[in-house]
Regions:
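Phosphate- and other anionic-substrate recognition elements at nucleic-acid/protein interfaces
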Residues: 1-154, 164-167, 265, 287
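Amphipathic alpha-helical interaction segments
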Residues: 99, 158-161, 165, 189, ...
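A residue-level signal for conserved active-site and pocket-lining positions in enzyme catalytic cores
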Residues: 100, 136, 256, 282, ...
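Short alpha-helical scaffolding segments that buttress acidic/His motifs in well-ordered protein cores
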Residues: 103, 126, 194, 208, ...
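Short helix-capping/linker segments at secondary-structure and domain boundaries
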Residues: 107-113, 143, 213-217, 262-270, ...
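Helix-hairpin-helix/helix-loop-helix acidic hairpins
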Residues: 147-203, 212, 264
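Phosphate-backbone recognition surface of nucleic-acid-processing proteins
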Residues: 202, 207-281, 285, 312, ...
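Basic, amphipathic alpha-helical segments enriched in Lys/Arg and hydrophobic/aromatic residues
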Residues: 280-323
């Protein structure tokens, strides 16, 4: 079974078929996507692998999936680590496509296509709305921080001037996100269920719906790794290193972390009790909050899987306090 790696840029798609060693370049537009599909079907390709490229890969990946082809989108870091392990230090579009194909052959054959939300245009639209809101919030935060740091009154005024407009745009985004969820009953039903959890607000609920379609379908460890809050070991010989988190969906993790801070310190009695126990056992506050975030994910996962609302008397088993 041939595997094709596809290196993506805004304008082009560079594809490399591993078994037949054929390379082609296509425009990254609807016509190019059709040409790519036809070429893959002609080669009898079983798996196509894209590097995540800031969203430029989405439309092409959607075209492949609509044509019945298996398409994966992978973290570029994983491909670079694979290339370095293979001794490939040079970097061109064609070499990148070949390395992506090699990575796919080594790790993805036999697995279903992995593209979050791309087979669901309604979720994709919601994800873009949620992402746009986050861009506006980040921009506002950055301007405010810069304004706080300057001493010139004129510079401060210039930096603060756009904030009211950004506030209005964020409010508009909130209304659009709420409307998008309300229009789609599966999303609306999920939002109502998640809204029963003390400490979860509209922003975190929308992020969960948009960016975590796997909620309720994986076990708690898989879900924690997906979000990027699973503790990874760092041991060697007799040395036991400190556990640490890495990878995952950073934007989602950041939003859920802020929700957890409020839930574990003020709004959610279950998470408050867990946070207190972790601190009493010597955990640092940030480590304890990450553990509470994992607990929150475990609870949410069970609620969605069981189709149950929040019930503090029927919570799933979580990791021990020492974790």
């Amino acid at each position: 079974m041939d595997v094709v790696g596809i290196d993506v840029s805004k304008a082009t798609l560079d594809a490399y078929a591993l078994t037949s060693q054929q390379a082609r370049q296509f425009a990254n537009d609807p016509g190019g996507h059709q040409g790519l599909v036809a070429w893959l079907q002609e080669l009898g390709v079983g798996v196509a692998v894209f590097e995540a490229s800031g969203g430029y890969e989405r439309a092409a990946a959607q075209s492949l999936r609509r044509a019945g082809l298996v398409a994966h989108v992978v973290d570029p870091k994983r491909v670079r680590y694979y290339a370095r392990a293979a001794g490939q230090l040079a970097k061109t579009d064609r070499i990148d496509a070949r390395m992506i194909a090699g990575f796919g052959a080594a790790f993805l054959l036999g697995k279903p296509g992995g593209i979050v939300g791309t087979d669901d245009p309604v979720r994709q639209d919601l994800a873009e709305l949620v992402g746009t809101r986050q861009v506006l919030v980040d921009h506002r935060t950055g301007l405010q921080q810069q304004a706080d740091a300057v001493t010139s009154a004129i510079a401060k005024k210039l930096l603060l001037a756009p904030l009211k407009q950004l506030d209005r745009q964020i409010e508009t985004s909130d209304r659009q996100i709420a409307a998008a969820i309300a229009r789609h009953e599966p999303f609306a039903a999920l939002a109502r269920r998640l809204d029963t959890v003390p400490g979860l607000g509209p922003v975190s609920i929308a992020a969960l719906i948009a960016w975590l379609p796997e909620l309720g379908q994986l076990d708690r460890r898989q879900l924690a790794a997906l979000v990027g809050v699973a503790p990874f070991a760092d041991d060697s010989g007799k040395r036991t290193g400190q556990r640490h988190i890495q990878g995952g969906r950073m934007k989602l993790r950041n939003i859920l972390y802020m929700a957890t801070v409020g839930a574990a310190t003020r709004h959610n009695p279950v998470l408050q009790a867990r946070y207190r126990r972790l601190l009493e056992n010597g955990k640092k506050p940030k480590v304890a909050l990450i553990a509470c975030l994992r607990t929150l994910l475990t609870i949410l996962n069970a609620m969605v899987a069981r189709q149950q609302d929040w019930n503090p008397t029927r919570l799933p088993a979580t990791e021990p306090v020492a974790a």
